[in-house]
Amino acid sequence: MNYVEIAVGSPNNRGNLVLRSELGHYLPKDGSPLYRSVYLYGDDAKEYANSHRTLKGYHGKRGIDNILIDIDRKDNSDEYTLKQLRNTLLHLNTLEVLDESIQCYFSGTGYHIVITNKVFNFQASDSLPYQVKQTMSNLFEDIDSSIYMRSGIYRVSHTKNQKTNLYKIPLTLKEALNYTYQQIHDMAKDPRFEYPYVLLDGDNELEGYICLDVPRIRQQSKVSEPTKIVPCVQTMLRNGPIQGSRHNTLLRIASYLKRNGVPS
């Protein structure tokens, strides 16, 4: 899957699929916003977009290259928002996600953390958006999961946030963990084209956390299960220990129980 959907200037200017490798060619010189899709698309989606001038109504396969965590400022203070970034980075560290697997950004108001899919190994499918949303919601408390919907997009780096007039810029982990919010804001007054990007890498560290169970649409109107355990945890308990994945399964169940207040 080699295509991403882009929107130039406004999230409303959608429906144009371009090669991911050529995304930089569409970066406006004046810093105007450029958005890209969360998901990757194949030739069938490209043909659909060409015919319909939109991806609305497309329910085929989607892939993903990076999983983005959106830490939005909302009505919070800049100090609190930066603290949330650092707490999330600490949580990733406890999950044994390596530094070389993530890239931090200041978005112009809040922060983005990009995790390479090499950490998860999500496979392309028509149910991928649901899998990503469920997986990330289970791993991270109070996460804004709306970005993982089928039509999710986000602004690319070196473009301006039109409300603050600050650029989305990449940050090193040292900067993210040690700089004040004011220092970060000062850096974001200009794009950061000179940033030394490195290719993100991973070794399936969080593959065992992926939620693969997708409820059928017709089941959504039915009465829910009497238990409040999420579907992927139900499946793990039902299947029991599986050779080669028992450690990851145990960690996932323990993490879920801890988040839901079950004492250790």
Kindly give the residue locations of the regions a language model identified.
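DNA replication initiation on ssDNA origins
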Residues: 1-67, 71-85, 149-153, 158-199
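Short amphipathic beta-strand starts and helix->beta connectors
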Residues: 48-55, 96-100, 235-240
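Core residues of folded domains in eukaryotic genome-function proteins
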Residues: 65, 98-100, 109, 152
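Modules that initiate DNA replication and primer synthesis
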Residues: 74-78, 86-89, 109-123, 158-162, ...
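Short amphipathic alpha-helix segments
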Residues: 82-97
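Secondary-structure boundary elements
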Residues: 93-99, 138-141
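Short beta-strand
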Residues: 101-108, 145-149
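Acidic, His- and aromatic-enriched active-site or binding-groove loops in soluble protein domains
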Residues: 121-142
